[in-house]
């Protein structure tokens, strides 16, 4: 049913469209794109609220139960443990996580006068056009009907028949998004068939700040590297995918499909034990994820509830942390995958993949706001524009974009700064050594860029 819009809402929507036009933004593939950037700064990140935490997944009834989880803190819910997710086509050359040694001065030195550039210098551009999300994947359910034996490298030694059922894409709850590019924004949410105007979303989400699942090493330096990966070698990183029940780790059921599992070195197959990702390029539509190297203590223990039978590991926790990446996203136009030539890197509340990343929304805390942060995402096939967006109770992002590294690589740092409630996504040139000096981090924090001010 069509709803009558107030004059205020109409004026606000008209102003948003005019701002986008004035900023020389372009409309392509259902999304607006404004200016290329080398830094995005999220501000006012964090809220105190409640989301629905999964407390049980019943294999007999195929039903999940949830309970209120109420918490707060600077950057919530992103001060909770996070898992790091990748979708092809992508080649990951480096990944790391840093934590401060004691109290980091760099997180306190940010000037309130930092210059923020938007689509047009000196002007705030407010956009309410829908961020077209492309996270859903066609899920292949693989039911294991006999034992599969693997060696220490995850290679199959003997294998009997399996029954593979390929069905339609399992719908996730990624159906509505709002995009914010200024502190004065009010949300306009759109669905596939209609648009409606509203004030900032009130979907509850929050999380308690959790300590790092991997302690900082006791070395000289202001930030210590707690996790690190280069192809074929990894420290305190566990690579996983959604091939549970196919190769000796994780589970499959007719209720919930494949769980997470250890990933083989190709990133695509399952494995019986943890392996480092090899020197590979992951093709379109395939996904893998990284957890820390620390196992959960047990179900309903230090990781909360998780699906029975999975390899359960901690994510990367703490309100102050730095993720670093070096990656390439080459073109991949030869296939017909659901997300063909649409690479992405994003963060999830680690509770989500430990229960159900894709499928019944009641089996995940995602819909109720426990947190997703898209760091670098292509929204339309073949695009060279990587956007960023936050999905939680605040929902926001920017129409500015990073250039996709189809040739060569992109090095980036993502800094979580609890002292002023900001998250910085920044292109960098520095090497990712065992320690980062406070001066380097301060330089990163001082870098101006595109504003993504949350309501």
From Swiss-Prot:
Range of residues in the leader sequence: 1-23
Enzyme Commission number: 3.2.1.39
Biased amino acid composition, Low complexity: 190-219
Compositional bias per record (Polar residues), positions renumbered to this chain: 172-189
Keywords associated with the record: Cell wall, Cell wall biogenesis/degradation, Glycoprotein, Glycosidase, Hydrolase, Secreted, Signal
Disruption phenotype: Leads to a slight sensitivity to the cell wall damaging agent calcofluor white. Also shows a slightly decreased ability to grow at 39 degrees Celsius. Results in an increased resistance to Quantazyme, a recombinant beta-1,3-glucanase that hydrolyzes beta-1,3-glucan.
Similarity field: Belongs to the PGA52 family.
Protein name: Probable circularly permuted 1,3-beta-glucanase TOS1
Taxonomic path: Eukaryota, Fungi, Dikarya, Ascomycota, Saccharomycotina
């Amino acid at each position: 049913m069509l709803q009558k819009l107030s004059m205020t809402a109409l004026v606000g929507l008209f102003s948003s469209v005019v701002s986008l036009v004035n900023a020389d933004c372009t409309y392509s593939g259902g999304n607006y794109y404004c200016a290329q950037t080398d830094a995005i700064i999220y501000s006012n990140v964090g809220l105190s609220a409640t989301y629905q935490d999964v407390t049980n997944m019943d294999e007999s009834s195929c039903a999940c139960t949830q309970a209120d989880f109420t918490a707060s803190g600077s950057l919530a819910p992103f001060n909770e443990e996070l898992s790091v997710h990748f979708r092809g086509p992508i080649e990951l050359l480096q990944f790391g996580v840093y934590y401060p040694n004691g109290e980091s001065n760099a997180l306190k030195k940010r000037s309130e006068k930092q210059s923020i550039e938007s689509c047009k210098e000196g002007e705030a551009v407010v956009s309410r056009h829908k961020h077209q999300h492309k996270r859903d994947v066609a899920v292949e359910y693989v039911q294991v009907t006999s034992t599969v034996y693997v060696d220490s490298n995850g290679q199959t030694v003997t294998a009997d028949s399996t029954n593979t059922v390929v069905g339609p894409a399992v719908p996730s709850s990624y159906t509505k998004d709002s995009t914010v590019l200024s502190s004065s924004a009010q949300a306009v949410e759109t669905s596939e068939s209609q648009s409606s105007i509203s004030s900032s979303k009130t979907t509850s989400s929050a999380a308690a700040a959790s300590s790092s699942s991997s302690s900082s090493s006791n070395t000289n330096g202001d930030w210590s590297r707690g996790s690190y990966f280069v192809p074929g070698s990894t420290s305190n990183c566990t690579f996983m995918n959604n091939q549970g029940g196919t190769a000796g780790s994780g589970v499959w059921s007719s209720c919930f499909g494949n769980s997470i599992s250890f990933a083989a070195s190709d990133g695509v197959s399952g494995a019986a034990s943890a392996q480092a990702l090899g020197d590979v390029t992951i093709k379109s539509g395939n996904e893998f994820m990284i957890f820390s190297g620390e196992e959960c203590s047990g179900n309903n223990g230090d990781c909360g509830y998780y699906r029975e039978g999975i390899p359960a590991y901690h994510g990367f926790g703490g309100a102050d942390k730095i993720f670093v990446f070096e990656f390439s996203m080459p073109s991949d136009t030869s296939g017909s995958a659901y997300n063909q030539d649409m690479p992405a890197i994003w963060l999830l509340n680690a509770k989500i993949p430990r229960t159900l990343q894709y499928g019944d929304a009641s089996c995940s805390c995602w819909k109720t706001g426990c947190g997703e942060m898209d760091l670098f995402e292509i929204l339309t096939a073949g695009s060279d524009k990587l956007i960023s967006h936050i999905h939680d109770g605040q929902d926001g992002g920017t129409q500015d974009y990073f250039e996709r590294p189809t040739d060569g690589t992109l090095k980036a740092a993502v800094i979580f700064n609890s002292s002023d409630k900001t998250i910085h996504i920044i292109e960098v040139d520095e090497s990712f050594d065992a320690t980062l000096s406070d001066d380097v981090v301060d330089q990163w924090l001082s870098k101006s860029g595109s504003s993504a001010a949350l309501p």
